[in-house]
């Protein structure tokens, strides 16, 4: 049985959990999940560091192989466990999805992550709200790029749901939650109709609601 290390409220662990659900794989039946990271600890023990020397979650064990990096784990699961061809396998769809997964890491996530950490991990007395606001507003610009593409297609890689949609939808959800939770600190969230429509499809046609946070995990206030 596969073993997934990571807490459910980690956005990177949520990617894996959502992917597993879409593949028809369920916790306790098809894989074991161990809470790790933040309040659960365990990710800096000698046992864990043998699996992932970075000491980060998620980490996946499958037989004698250990994988880290959430996007890599999703690619592996889709390649090895998608027996019913849930995700498209044609080259065009595959690499459009890959493109968005890479864009998320290099262009979009850094600003959103900085705003999130600034508001949920840094004590209030130490927060730089000017930088937090700038990072959030820069995220608005990044999401406008995605919105423009979704104007002409149903999902990020074309007509079918793919791994890239998992990555991006979780980030859009966090972008929305940040503004709902800290509206005065983030500044306004740009209204992007094509992203709104895409998220509506995601909630209606996929298993997003089973793993998505209802509120932010705020560690410090």
Task: Locate the predicted segments by residue.
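C-terminal helix/juxtamembrane-tail motif
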Residues: 208-221
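Active-site-flanking alpha-helical
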Residues: 78, 171-172, 212
């Amino acid at each position: 049985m596969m073993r997934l290390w990571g807490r459910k409220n980690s956005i990177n662990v949520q990617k894996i959990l959502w992917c597993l659900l879409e593949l028809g794989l369920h916790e306790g039946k098809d894989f074991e999940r161990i809470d790790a990271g933040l309040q659960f600890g365990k990710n800096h023990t000698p046992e864990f560091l043998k699996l992932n020397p970075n000491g980060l979650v998620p980490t996946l064990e499958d037989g004698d192989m250990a994988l880290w990096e959430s996007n890599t784990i999703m690619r592996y699961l889709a390649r090895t466990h998608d027996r019913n061809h849930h995700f498209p396998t044609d080259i065009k769809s595959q690499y459009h999805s890959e493109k968005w997964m890479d864009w998320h890491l290099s262009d979009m996530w850094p600003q959103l992550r900085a705003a999130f950490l600034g508001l949920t991990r840094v004590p209030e007395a130490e927060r730089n709200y000017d930088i937090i606001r700038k990072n959030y507003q820069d995220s608005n610009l990044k999401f406008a790029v995605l919105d423009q593409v979704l104007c002409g297609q149903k999902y990020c890689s074309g007509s079918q749901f793919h791994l890239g949609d998992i990555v991006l939808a979780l980030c859009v959800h966090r972008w929305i939650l940040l503004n709902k939770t800290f509206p005065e600190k983030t500044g306004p969230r740009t209204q992007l109709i094509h992203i709104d429509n895409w998220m509506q499809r995601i909630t209606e046609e996929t298993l997003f609601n089973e793993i998505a946070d209802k509120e932010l995990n705020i560690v410090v206030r």
